Amino acid sequence: MVMTDPIADFLTRIRNANQVKHEVLEVPASNIKKGIAEILKREGFIKNVEVIEDGKQGIIRVFLKYGQNGERVITNLKRVSKPGLRIYSKREDVPKVLNGLGIAIISTSEGLLTDKEARQKNVGGEVIAYVW
């Protein structure tokens, strides 16, 4: 089966695993998925990320994070730019998610960045997803 939007699939797998409070999630690897997972780790939305090389595509193992009482750290993830409708943001118009409580993941010429990093580096790009 051909997957038309692997990023949306990755975000959906995280969302679904988060809803049923799984500790670990495994997805097929790609560079953009690794980048998104690293941003989520750096911003404190997930515990850890491991990349397992299996000689083929590889696997990304994502360790989800929950609060002390079991509450979810990730409230929601939303895919913004899709294969059928790309959404770009100029450097002046980089979006804020929930007035800074969430993050926007943006693919720029500098690589994958959060909205805050994109504003600091004064770059725009394709808005991949919102996480809050």
UniProtKB/Swiss-Prot annotation:
UniProt cross-references to InterPro entries, sorted A to Z: Ribosomal_uS8, Ribosomal_uS8_CS, Ribosomal_uS8_sf
GO cellular component, one term: ribosome
GO BP of this protein: translation
Keyword rRNA-binding included in the entry's annotation: yes
The organism's place on the tree of life at top rank: Bacteria
Keywords: Ribonucleoprotein, Ribosomal protein, RNA-binding, rRNA-binding
GO molecular function: rRNA binding; structural constituent of ribosome
Keyword Phosphoprotein: no
Family: Belongs to the universal ribosomal protein uS8 family.
Subunit structure: Part of the 30S ribosomal subunit. Contacts proteins S5 and S12.
Functional description taken from the UniProt entry: One of the primary rRNA binding proteins, it binds directly to 16S rRNA central domain where it helps coordinate assembly of the platform of the 30S subunit.
Protein's name in the database: Small ribosomal subunit protein uS8
Gene that specifies this protein: rpsH
